[in-house]
């Protein structure tokens, strides 16, 4: 059995893609938490790859990564009573930073667990 067949065999559910309305709701929810980041193009890469290439520059996001969008959306979708208890995540990277910043901006207590190595 090949590696790809093994992976395919282990997939047990289908991913439900968000609808356009879901994306618009998320955009409205997180709007005050994120920077609007540019989309750039490269005519050099377009020619080499023979297609149009777009770069969404999420490195200009608050804390420097797209994770800010998901973290802030997750917090803002949570039940207000649950948020009073605070939030927690286990991450040593961009998601930890995004949860910490989103929580701070929302006045929510956050616990970030980071590995030692």
Model regions: which residues?
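PLP-dependent amino-acid enzyme catalytic core
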Residues: 2-117
């Amino acid at each position: 059995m090949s590696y790809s067949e093994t992976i395919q065999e282990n997939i047990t559910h289908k991913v439900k893609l968000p609808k356009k309305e879901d994306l618009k709701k998320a955009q409205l929810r997180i709007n005050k938490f994120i920077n609007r980041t540019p989309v750039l193009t490269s005519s050099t890469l377009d020619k080499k790859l023979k297609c149009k290439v777009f770069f969404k520059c999420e490195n200009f996001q608050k804390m420097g990564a797209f994770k800010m969008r998901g973290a802030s959306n997750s917090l803002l979708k949570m039940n207000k009573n649950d948020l009073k208890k605070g939030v927690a995540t286990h991450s040593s990277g961009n998601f930890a930073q995004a949860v910490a910043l989103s929580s701070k901006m929302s006045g929510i207590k956050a616990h970030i667990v980071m590995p030692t190595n």
